[in-house]
Regions:
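Conserved catalytic alpha/beta core of Sir2/sirtuin-type deacylases, generalized to analogous enzyme cores
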Residues: 1-312
């Protein structure tokens, strides 16, 4: 088992006994009580910490698909029929048939897979332009792998570009891009896909689903372990350097995958530093307050302002 995976497991197990704190949206860690600096100063500090770091480990967390113009464009027919307010509502709806479920999932996956690279990602890329970096993400929206090569990204919660067997009869995953395109084309203006296009495992015939945690029995096989190997090897190679752990948008559902490991590693590595950007919380542990920065603001605004400050 790799270093980072072991750390995630330990922190996840610890969280079970502290469920009340997490359920309330808080954290059991002792947080800094220092008054945050004004926003403009935080942006200056962010830019300075980027420049001072030898390397950066980015932790990309939650990005939400809300009820906006883009959502209505792609999902309007489902919103009108079922009353959904955002794309993720439909992902876990109790659908009456597999054909109806895949009508929605195919639309969701097609929209995700073909979405253009969003500006916050372009701004982040400019910020990291002169740095040795690696990206660890719990996002499955493929934005990071559109931007960076496979070896520079660890997707520890899966990837919408792949299908897996719902029974986990095989360790293999397979391409989802072409089947998704075929389902969307066949569905047209309707709400359901043809029965013969419902994705199935080529080995046992069971229904397939996206290789993403949350859809069912998430396959934690070779591809999953590869994600942890990549980030663990990067950490091992850079442990003696000035690593900046950059946490972007980690929510309260899964803090043990990015946030808490970043806190632990910052505390353990004497030259490490830490930045968190979140529009809902401003958590900075007391143990790393002298080497940390927590910015409560919109990620898109922060990254745009840091990029401007750096002149990139």
């Amino acid at each position: 088992m790799t270093l980072y995976e072991q750390l995630v497991i330990e922190l996840t197990n610890r969280s079970f006994s502290l469920h009340a704190a997490y359920r309330s949206g808080s954290t059991p860690y002792e947080l800094s009580d220092r008054e945050p600096e004004p926003y403009d100063q935080q942006i200056e500090d962010f830019a300075r910490m980027i420049e001072e770091a030898d390397c950066v480990l980015v932790g990309g967390g939650d990005f939400y698909y809300e009820d906006n113009a883009t959502y209505r464009k792609h999902f309007g027919k489902f919103a009108e029929r079922y009353g959904f307010k955002g794309a993720f509502e439909g992902s876990f709806y109790r659908w009456p048939t597999a054909e109806a479920r895949w009508g929605y999932l195919a639309t969701f996956l097609d929209t995700t897979l073909n979405a253009p690279l969003r500006k916050p990602y372009r701004d982040l890329d400019a910020i990291l332009a002169e740095k040795d970096f690696f990206v660890l993400t719990t996002n499955q929206d493929t934005q990071f792998v559109k931007l960076y090569p496979w070896e520079k990204v660890a997707e520890i919660q899966g990837d919408h570009r792949f299908f897996q067997c719902s029974r986990c009869c095989t360790d293999a995953v397979w391409d989802a891009v072409e089947p998704v395109s075929n389902m969307v084309e066949a569905m047209g203006d309707g709400l359901e896909v043809p029965t013969e296009l419902v994705p199935r495992c080529p080995h046992c015939g069971a229904e397939a689903f996206p290789w993403v945690r949350g859809y069912g029995n998430f396959l934690q096989g070779e591809l999953y372990e590869e994600q942890y190997r990549k980030v663990s090897e990067w950490l091992d190679a850079h442990a003696r350097q000035r690593i900046l752990f950059l946490e972007l948008g980690v929510g309260r559902m899964t803090p043990a995958f990015i946030q808490e490991p970043f806190w632990a590693l910052t505390a353990q590595l004497p030259q490490a530093s830490y930045i968190a950007v979140n529009n809902k919380t401003q958590f900075l542990p007391r143990a790393i307050e002298d080497r940390g920065l927590a910015v409560r603001a919109d990620i898109a605004d922060v990254l745009a302002d840091v990029r401007k400050t750096l002149g990139r």
